[in-house]
């Protein structure tokens, strides 16, 4: 098994303008198959209707079918934050008690703005807490204070809420918390500063190095990581590719490259 293997799930086509996943080293050959060795498996889901911001029942069924070949215990790049609900499709396959560690500038615990309990990019954590008995803890790092409006969330003992400002002083306590159950990591790049990511949503000011160092510390403290996903790409405008979008794509690609490189320090196990 290739431990560096990671998975790209294209929903908006944003990865087409990024270079981090393309094979640069022509010399790197698979000696058995005699062709370039790829570290990446690309799954195209751009044709699935009813998947932007919210996930219709039909879209969910189709996504579950297309993602069935992708193991939970791997690194997944899942496109723009508009599709962050894809995390739930991996979480629902975890068949043991676990914690969710979410780095995000938004809580993703909001009731669906579309009503009717619809699964959306802003409600998927709530869906997970309501429907997945194996999810014992959700550790949310980075949400803005105004996201705390949902009072019932603050009363839910399964949720640990840490703002950016609190993160450094809370790290030790979080490491202890994350050693209780195996952990699935979800990183929305909108938690990062604008020198490291360009997203479709309001952003925080965290640094990628802060997050990666914390994951290393958590692992040293006994955390077991099940898998990880990354979202927060900038969607390409329908009218075409502009210079600022090219700059954003290059920035996001560079950050994704660092995450991809870091994954060899993480061992995912189910």
Which role fits each region the language model picked out?
Residues 2-78, 82-99, 137-270:
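Catalytic cores of soluble, metal-dependent hydrolases
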């Amino acid at each position: 098994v290739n431990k560096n293997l990671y998975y790209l799930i294209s929903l908006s086509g944003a990865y087409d303008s990024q270079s981090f996943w393309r094979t640069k080293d022509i010399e790197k050959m698979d000696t058995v198959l005699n062709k370039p060795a790829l570290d990446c498996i690309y799954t195209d889901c751009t044709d699935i209707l009813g998947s932007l911001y919210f996930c219709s029942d039909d879209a969910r069924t189709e996504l579950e079918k297309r993602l069935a070949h992708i193991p939970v215990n791997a690194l997944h790049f899942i496109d723009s934050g508009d599709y962050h609900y894809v995390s739930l499709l991996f979480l629902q396959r975890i068949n043991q008690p676990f914690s969710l560690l979410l780095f995000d500038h938004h809580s993703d615990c909001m009731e669906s703005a579309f009503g009717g309990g619809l699964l959306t990019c802003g409600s998927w954590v709530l869906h997970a807490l309501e429907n997945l008995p194996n999810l014992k803890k959700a550790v949310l790092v980075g949400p803005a204070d105004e996201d705390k409006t949902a009072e019932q969330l603050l009363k839910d003992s399964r949720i640990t809420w840490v703002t950016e400002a609190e993160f450094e002083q809370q790290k030790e306590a979080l490491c202890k918390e994350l050693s209780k159950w195996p952990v699935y990591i979800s990183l929305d790049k909108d938690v990062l500063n604008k020198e490291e990511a360009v997203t479709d949503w309001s952003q925080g000011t965290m640094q990628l190095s802060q997050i990666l160092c914390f994951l290393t510390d958590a692992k040293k403290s006994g955390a077991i990581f099940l898998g990880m996903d990354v979202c927060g790409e900038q969607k390409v405008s329908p009218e075409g590719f502009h210079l600022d979008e090219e700059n954003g794509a290059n920035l996001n690609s560079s950050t994704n490259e660092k995450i991809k490189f870091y994954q060899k320090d993480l061992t995912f196990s189910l």
